Swiss-Prot record:
Organism encoding this protein: Lactococcus lactis subsp. lactis (strain IL1403) (Streptococcus lactis)
Catalytic activity, as annotated: pseudouridine(1915) in 23S rRNA + S-adenosyl-L-methionine = N(3)-methylpseudouridine(1915) in 23S rRNA + S-adenosyl-L-homocysteine + H(+)
EC number: 2.1.1.177
Keywords in alphabetical order: Cytoplasm, Methyltransferase, rRNA processing, S-adenosyl-L-methionine, Transferase
This protein's GO CC annotations: cytoplasm
Biological function: Specifically methylates the pseudouridine at position 1915 (m3Psi1915) in 23S rRNA.
Gene symbol of the encoding locus: rlmH
Molecular function via GO: rRNA (pseudouridine-N3-)-methyltransferase activity
The family this protein is said to belong to: Belongs to the RNA methyltransferase RlmH family.
Domain of life of the source: Bacteria
Descriptive protein name: Ribosomal RNA large subunit methyltransferase H
Sites where the protein binds S-adenosyl-L-methionine: I75, G108, F127, G128, R129, M130, T131, L132
Protein location: Cytoplasm
Quaternary data: Homodimer.
Length: 159
């Protein structure tokens, strides 16, 4: 099994790239993490609701094209389930033991995720009701994936 992180948009800030690279390097000997960046759709100024939905749908199609039939899909959603690090670790462990494909986490674009992505998801995770930059959320999620692996291996990293 592999863990994949599918994200909409490019990571620009070097400090975030460096932080993510450090956790990816640490995970190299455990469950490897593959990050897949998808181009975001350009949002016109004053886009109508219909235009915004069409853009989300196109981004959703790109996301779903990266998901295989046996993959478990966890999406980040403000209205998703609040989970402790231990609960995330349990989810990762169950995917590793019982899953038939890869474990895929998704961070959508600035408009959110399409209803098709929501419908395909196996789990919707919330990190709280605060709005955070998607690029920063990427680092937070990668750290939590690393932490989950450390918890599952009984490491002292998680205290």
């Amino acid at each position: 099994m592999k863990i994949k992180l599918v994200v909409v948009g490019k990571l620009k800030e070097k400090y975030l790239k460096d932080g993510i690279a450090e956790y990816v390097k640490r995970m190299g000997t455990m469950l490897p993490l593959e990050i897949i960046e998808l181009a975001d759709e350009k949002i016109p100024d004053n886009a109508s609701e219909k235009e915004a939905e069409a853009l989300k749908k196109r981004e959703g199609e790109k996301i779903l094209s990266r998901i295989q039939a046996g993959d478990q899909l966890a999406i980040l959603a403000i209205q998703g389930k609040l989970m402790s690090s231990e609960e995330v670790a349990d989810f990762v462990k169950k995917a590793e033991v019982y899953g038939t494909g890869n474990l895929v986490f998704v961070i959508g674009g600035s408009l959110g995720l399409s209803k098709e992505v929501y419908q395909r998801s196996d789990l919707q995770i919330s990190f709280g009701r605060m709005t955070l930059p998607h690029q920063l959320m990427r680092l937070v999620l990668v750290e939590q994936i690393y932490r989950a692996q450390m918890i599952n291996r009984g490491s002292a990293y998680h205290k």
